[in-house]
Regions:
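Short hydrophobic transmembrane-like helices used for membrane targeting/insertion
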Residues: 3-4, 25, 42, 48, ...
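Short, isolated positions in well-ordered beta-strands
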Residues: 11, 33-34, 68
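Short, mixed-charge low-complexity intrinsically disordered segments
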Residues: 48-87
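A short, charged, amphipathic alpha-helix used as a generic interaction element across diverse proteins
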Residues: 35-53
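Hydrophobic beta-strand residues in large extracellular and virion-surface proteins
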Residues: 2-6, 11, 42, 59-63
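A short, compositionally biased
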Residues: 1-3, 17-23, 53-58
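Short aromatic-glycine-(Arg/Gly/Cys) micro-motifs in beta-strand/loop hairpins
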Residues: 6-28
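A short, exposed loop/beta-hairpin motif centered on an aromatic-Gly-Thr core
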Residues: 23-41
Length: 87
C-alpha cells in the first residue's frame, strides 16, 4: 500500500490502475473514504507524479476519476511517499 503523507493527513492508495503522461493513476485503498466534491460525483482515484515514487520521495497528488480529462483533476498538494504493509 502506498501512503502519501501531507501535513496533518494522508491518502492511502492500493495499486496503480493506469497512467496519463508523467502521472500514475492509483485507486484509493479499500479502507479509505472516497472524495465526494458534490452529491453526484464520487472519485476513487488519485493521479500522482512521479507515477511510481520511491520511499521518502516528494509526490504531487491530484484527485480524479480514471476517465476524467486531466484539466478536471483536483489538486490536493504535495506529500511524501511511504510504503506500508496491509494491516
Amino acid at each position: 500500500m502506498l501512503v502519501i503523507r501531507f501535513k496533518g493527513w494522508s491518502v492511502k492508495l492500493d495499486h496503480q490502475v493506469g497512467g496519463a503522461g508523467k502521472f500514475g493513476i492509483w485507486s484509493f485503498h479499500g479502507s479509505e473514504s472516497s472524495y465526494v466534491p458534490d452529491m453526484e460525483t464520487i472519485l476513487r482515484h488519485a493521479a500522482i507524479r512521479p507515477a511510481e515514487p520511491k520511499e521518502g520521495a516528494e509526490v504531487e497528488v491530484l484527485i480524479c476519476d480514471s476517465r476524467m480529462p486531466q484539466d478536471e483533476w483536483r489538486a490536493v498538494g504535495t506529500g511524501v511517499a511511504a510504503y506500508e504493509a496491509e494491516r
